[in-house]
Amino acid sequence: MKEKGFVDSMALRKNLWQTVLHGEFDGYLVYPRRLCTTKVDLKKLRPMIYERIEKRANEYPVRAMVPVAVEVLKARNVLIQGVSALLQSFPVMACKFCPEIFIDEKGHLIRTCHGYKRHAKNRCHEWVAGGLDDILVPVETYHLNNMFQGVIKHNQRFDFDRISAIDELCWQAGVDPCGNIVSGNSQGSEFLSPYDLTFVANRTLTAWETLRSGVLKLLFVYPAKVCKYCSEVHVGPSGHKARLCGVFNYESWRGAHFWTKAEVDDLVPPKIVWRRRPQDPPILVDEGKGYYGRVPAILDLCAKAGALVPAKYNSMMKAQGLSGPAFCR
């Protein structure tokens, strides 16, 4: 009996080890632990890493992305011209103390203003006349000599020019943006006919979509960074070291930027605004802010001029939604 028990125990151990070696035990995968460690000599790897970085720099700019950059610059120019023309017929109001804007002759009464330096909360806006920069928010970045140059230090922050982030992205893609800069007032001050307004609005909205899709394609190839705590953008594989984050009293972070991956909205801010629909009151009130639509400013401006809005924005526009809590009773 003892010999039989010993044989059964040895057979059980043998089956258990075979199960472990095959990597499966009770439905779970079991991986044997490594019994040795691999030592890496960083002194030998450092020259290889530097050589790989130099070879990578020779691969840029990517030829296939040059037409995309050209298309982005053309779309940006058409967008500036179109918005400048539409603003002659549709005024924009901007808050005096916060970034809020509203496309109408009068502002709204929605209490979302945080005041100067964020010292207030949920107060009414104080409206003044807005302009092109309130709709197309300018985003600037440092202009690099080449894509893989050294990191800009704090004491070098005045040695580099500040240009548009779109221009810098297209310049790194192999296109010189200097010949594509246009003036925002190139359309003149003449008012357009309703037919011309609709044509300009459709062309402007198409340019907006082309610009954003082109920037998205470029960001897949050319890296860009944005600070987690402020709106600073850097086009390049790594951010700069200029300690400019938190220079305002209401910002919690002080010193160097905390860089994360930049998205399309960081380089081309959509500037979300409240949209007044036909069923809404003449002046939007605070009680109905949960019912009003919230759309990009470009979309609202072009829709007022008669442009066809893409279906993907229907949920943001709330075109068939209720006007306020009074209609829910």
Regions found by a protein language model. Give the residues of each.
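Cys/His-rich zinc-coordinating modules
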Residues: 4-9, 13, 19-73, 77-85, ...
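Core mature regions of organelle-targeted
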Residues: 83-97, 103, 113, 120-123
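Structured beta-strand/turn binding interfaces of compact recognition modules in eukaryotic regulators
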Residues: 98-101, 114-116, 230-233, 246-248
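Short, basic interhelical loop/turn and adjoining N-cap
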Residues: 104, 236
